[in-house]
Amino acid sequence: MARFQMSNLVGDPFALATVSIAILAWIITVVSCIIAQTKEAIPNFFWWSVAYQFCIVVGITAVMGSNTGHVYSTAIVGYAAAGLVCTTFTIDGLVTSKEGARQSGGAGLILLAMTDIVWIFYFGSTPQSRPRTYIDSFAPHKEQPSYRSSKPISHSYTPRPETTVSSAHQPHLYSSAPLSGFESSPMAGYNATTASSTGIQPMVGLQTNASTVGGDTAEIGQPTEYPYRAKAIYSYEANPDDANEISFTKHEILEVSDVSGRWWQAKKSTGETGIAPSNYLILL
């Protein structure tokens, strides 16, 4: 489980700014509502909105401090949207009052609502979106987990299966000595034209042809053209068990040949080629 680190907040200008504004706005709201409560009772719904916003601020602070926004982004968007609705209804009952304490509380809730809107936009956007990429570029520590915590879904290409003869079905091969006088005799029922079209070979020459079939299973040729250029928005460590993957660092520029799948065939500036996850890259 990821641990909370203060450096994640201090090193991220976006997190530091939004969390600081939200905490300050919540304190202003609470103090103003307490002062207003001494003069005139405040509806219970107002206090519920303030308490709910407190939970949102604490939760998002913990998420940003532990750098797990990519894990809880969906939950954050839902909770922040509900908090925005509650805060909006509460604002109307405070800012329309002629009492200064209530108006101050309404101003604090307006700041909280604006912060909720910013959080909804940020956590509701994908990492590939330009605004979020720009915001995350100021926080070098924001790295998504590598292959160890993510399961590859599909590859842009798959190698063809090897055509090999199973050891359980190996035919009996005979020496040429017992076949003396029959080397040039065609096999009964054997048609050379049919064999060439179907790939079926006589048993006598099976050993040589089997080695030929094995030799045909060469590696699939790599693409020769890379018309696209992509920038890495996160660092990625290749899976050592998969020779097709390549590693790259944040902000590294890669050349890409195909962008149709979730795994792209890419080429590094060093000439190294392989597949890279598309959610770690953004097209230029």
Swiss-Prot record:
Annotated Gene3D superfamilies: SH3 Domains (2.30.30.40)
Transmembrane intervals: 15-35, 45-65, 75-95, 104-124
One Pfam family linked to the record: SH3_1
Segments on the Cytoplasmic face: 1-14, 66-74, 125-284
Main location: membrane
Signal peptide boundaries: none
Keywords: Cell membrane, Membrane, SH3 domain, Stress response, Transmembrane, Transmembrane helix
Segments of this protein annotated with the region Disordered: 138-170
Keyword NADP: no
Entry's localization field: Cell membrane
Role noted for this protein: Plasma membrane osmosensor that activates the high osmolarity glycerol (HOG) MAPK signaling pathway in response to high osmolarity.
Family recorded in the similarity comment: Belongs to the SHO1 family.
Record-given protein name: High osmolarity signaling protein SHO1
Organism, as annotated: Arthroderma otae (strain ATCC MYA-4605 / CBS 113480) (Microsporum canis)
